[in-house]
């Protein structure tokens, strides 16, 4: 995975993430949209034959886009950890 900043402003961030597809894009954008202060979050895959997504984040200024992204990633990490613990606790 390689991440490139395509555009960065005080309330807008656009990233290119190489080596990823809709799986990560949908998870990140969906989580970002639940964060207070995020006005808009989306992603798209420029071409269906490439493993690359573009993520766009727009905030209302109460949170920096990079901070919103970090919060979204931490939320996903905690959620995944919770699911791992739940699955480990299942009995056969």
Curated annotation (Swiss-Prot):
Coiled coil residues, start to end: none
Reactions this protein catalyses: RNA(n) + a ribonucleoside 5'-triphosphate = RNA(n+1) + diphosphate
SUPFAM superfamilies named in the record: RBP11-like subunits of RNA polymerase
Q: What is its EC number?
A: 2.7.7.6
Pfam families in the cross-refs:
RNA_pol_L_2
**UniProt-annotated location(s):** Cytoplasm
Keywords noted in UniProt: Cytoplasm, DNA-directed RNA polymerase, Nucleotidyltransferase, Transcription, Transferase
Q: Which InterPro entries match?
A: RBP11-like, RBP11-like_dimer, RNA_pol_Rpb11_13-16kDa_CS, Rpo11-like
- UniProt main location, coarse: cytoplasm
Any GO CC annotation of this UniProt entry: cytoplasm
One GO MF term attached to the UniProt entry: DNA-directed RNA polymerase activity
What function does this protein fulfil?
Answer: DNA-dependent RNA polymerase (RNAP) catalyzes the transcription of DNA into RNA using the four ribonucleoside triphosphates as substrates.
Family as reported in the entry's similarity comment:
Belongs to the archaeal Rpo11/eukaryotic RPB11/RPC19 RNA polymerase subunit family.
Q: What is this protein called?
A: DNA-directed RNA polymerase subunit Rpo11
């Amino acid at each position: 995975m390689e991440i490139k900043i395509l555009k960065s402003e005080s309330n807008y961030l656009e990233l290119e993430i190489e080596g990823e597809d809709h799986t990560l894009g949908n998870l990140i954008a969906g989580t970002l949209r639940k964060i207070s202060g995020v006005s808009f979050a989306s992603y798209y895959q420029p071409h269906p034959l490439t493993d690359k997504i573009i993520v766009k984040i727009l905030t209302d200024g109460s949170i920096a886009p990079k901070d919103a992204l970090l919060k979204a990633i931490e939320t996903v990490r905690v959620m995944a950890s919770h699911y791992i613990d739940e699955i480990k606790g299942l009995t056969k």
